[in-house]
Amino acid sequence: MSVKVKICGLTRDEDVRVACEAGADFCGVVVEVPKSPRSQTREQARFLFEKATTATVVVTRSKSLDELIELVRFLSPFALQLHGDETPDLIAALRGKVSCQIWKALPLPPATEQASIQFLLEQIQSFAKAGCDAFVLDTATAQGFGGTGVVASWEIAADLVRLSDVPCFLAGGLTPENVAEAVAAVKPYGVDVSSGVEISPGVKDPEKVRLFCRKAKRVP
């Protein structure tokens, strides 16, 4: 089975169309995250989701349980991807209230740094037990977490993918030029790209989107 592809940080309906036509499996929209240059209102996100012919993913962070439930009811996504300080207890409470998949982003160090595999694996196990359906392994830097364009440690990601019972997406610094190598090295369930296929924040390059999908899915 070929690797799944998620095109994230979508802000324009034409980019949603390109992503779907290129073979992306998931279209991600950042919703109500003020610090993100790709953030959309829930009304804008619903407009974009209406244009999608593939599974939709809401990406948000640091909201209360009630706010998350309300957001899911408004947008009816395939998955809710959480990038903030959410706890396993919040995930467990949310799991009982929504029917969509719940994905949790976990911060990995940049390729130039190291981290405790055991600590990260314990996080995965704790969130999986609480009800997470998938994890997004993304790069954490001093500049932020997610959408940084900084390559994560593939060595650590590969260990987590191998040891996790739950599907893991690889994110962080992926581009059409390195995604095939990343998939071969890490063997993730899926890959998640935003800045690596952009002209500017939130504006996708159609050729890069198409090439990224082709390169990702050609890897055995």
Which stretches of residues belong to each language-model region?
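Conserved N-terminal beta1-alpha1 strand-loop-helix module at the mouth
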Residues: 1-190, 195-220
